[in-house]
Amino acid sequence: MNKYYNMKKVILLFIVAIISNTIAISQNSEEAEKLLNKVSENIKSYSNIYINYTYTLFNSEEDINQTNKGSFVTEDDKWKFVMLDVTRIFDGDKLYTISPDDEEVTISTQNPDDESTITPNKMLYFYEEGYNFEMDIVQYVGRKKIQYVKLIPMDSDAEIKYILLGVDIEFSQIYKVIETGVNDTQTTIAIVDFEVNLPLEESLFVFDKEKYKDYYMNILD
């Protein structure tokens, strides 16, 4: 009698533990999603955004450790993006890629479905689709409280293991993005400056052909 009673008790406790764990995971996921939704809403409330950042690529096995600086500014559907000395300007119609090393300007129509194309929108809203969320660690950087959210790709064939997205809790802004690939390459984007609602000149998103009259114009479409 005691034997069967104890067995039932163990099974019951096991079921309760599973249910409790499932509820905790669900609450954790909801809390993470709520935080990311707040970040998205906050970003979309700004008339424009200017960001300076560092971009670090690290893989100890491949002996890779590279850090570069970049910046971008975006307003409505227009943006300007600078990285590795290459400037990209999207005026709402055409995309201009300016490469000083090649002395070339490539003019094309932006394809929003092209996954290889880096745009400010992809950097600011990449987490909105294709991931499961869960709350991760909290770090303090000076007086800043940074809450990390772990993003796990829904696609089992994704080249990404997971992403840690650091959020500045006080301002509901992205602070850092740490991506770990299936090959253990770690890509880190750290926000250095995050400015919003600036008085921008209209010419900022205009390609001035006169400045590049000695460059080769590669018109794709």
Language-model regions: role of each:
Residues 10-20:
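Sec-dependent N-terminal signal peptides
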Residues 131-138, 142-220:
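Gly/Pro-enriched, hydrophobic low-complexity segments
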Residues 55-57, 83, 99-100, 178-181:
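Beta-turn initiation residues at beta-strand->coil junctions
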Residues 69-118, 187-188:
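An acidic-aromatic
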Residues 110-145:
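Flexible, surface-exposed loop/linker segments and immediately adjacent secondary-structure boundaries
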Residues 22-63, 77, 211-221:
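N-terminal leader/targeting segments and the immediate start of mature chains
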Residues 1-10:
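Positively charged n-region of N-terminal signal peptides that target proteins for export
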